[in-house]
Regions:
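Mature, Sec-exported extracytoplasmic domains of Gram-positive
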Residues: 1-17, 21-218
Length: 218
């Protein structure tokens, strides 16, 4: 993987039709708790403003991919590429844990360790690794997927689009320095807005709705 600068930041927002929506931010930060509280307050304020602007104007996953290809030169990652293999492996594990945990037997629930106890943490990590290996060995037919990984490049940095047509999953993640992040943030907002929401999403505040609001509130 390419080495990022010390000021590199990354953001991932992932959501599915029924699954959880997650936001991951990573970067070097020495902010104090007060600054974090202020930042969170600003985010909540922005979120309320964004919610008032959301209207139903949905597009399908296929339409969104074509839109990104036409406007941002989106390219697809080959299934043989390491990144694709890692992503689909993670998706398979996530889907089995969420929808078919019974296949894992006693490994479906791994107790959280005592983080002050090194032996407890090592045992926990060992079980997580064993479970991941168990899932990886399961046939793909157990949890059918139609996964595709795409990229939009800006110089040496890129935005990734993760899509699964079977599970209706749409996710974006990107990284880079502040200048690149600003561009990717704008692209991300445009793509989430184009994917949009249905009237039912707005009415029921679905995961798809939450995903859009979250992205536009960042």
């Amino acid at each position: 993987m390419e080495q990022k600068s010390k000021n590199a930041i990354s953001i991932s927002i992932i959501g599915g039709a029924d699954g959880p929506t997650s936001i991951f931010t990573a970067g070097h930060s020495k902010k104090q708790p007060l600054k974090i509280r202020i930042k969170n307050s600003i985010y909540r304020y922005k979120r309320k403003k964004v919610e008032k602007t959301i209207v139903a104007n949905p597009h399908s996953l296929s339409e969104t991919v074509q839109y990104a290809k036409d406007k941002y030169e989106l390219t697809e990652t080959a299934p043989a590429d390491r990144e694709y293999i890692e992503q689909i492996k993670c998706l398979k594990e996530s889907l089995i844990l969420q929808y078919k945990p019974e296949l894992l037997g006693e490994m479906k629930d791994i107790p959280v360790p005592d983080f002050s106890n090194e032996a407890s943490v090592k045992e926990y990590l060992g079980k997580i690794k064993t479970r991941s290996e168990m899932i990886a060995e399961m046939p793909d037919s157990i949890i059918p997927m139609d996964f595709h990984l795409y990229k939009i490049r800006i110089d040496d940095d890129f935005l990734e689009m993760e899509i699964d047509y079977t599970w209706n999953i749409f996710g974006l993640s990107y990284s880079g320095n502040k200048a690149v992040m600003k561009k990717f943030k704008k692209i991300s907002g445009d793509l989430y807005s184009y994917y949009g929401v249905t009237e039912e999403d707005v009415k029921n505040k679905t995961k798809r709705y939450s995903l859009l609001v979250t992205n536009l509130s960042l």
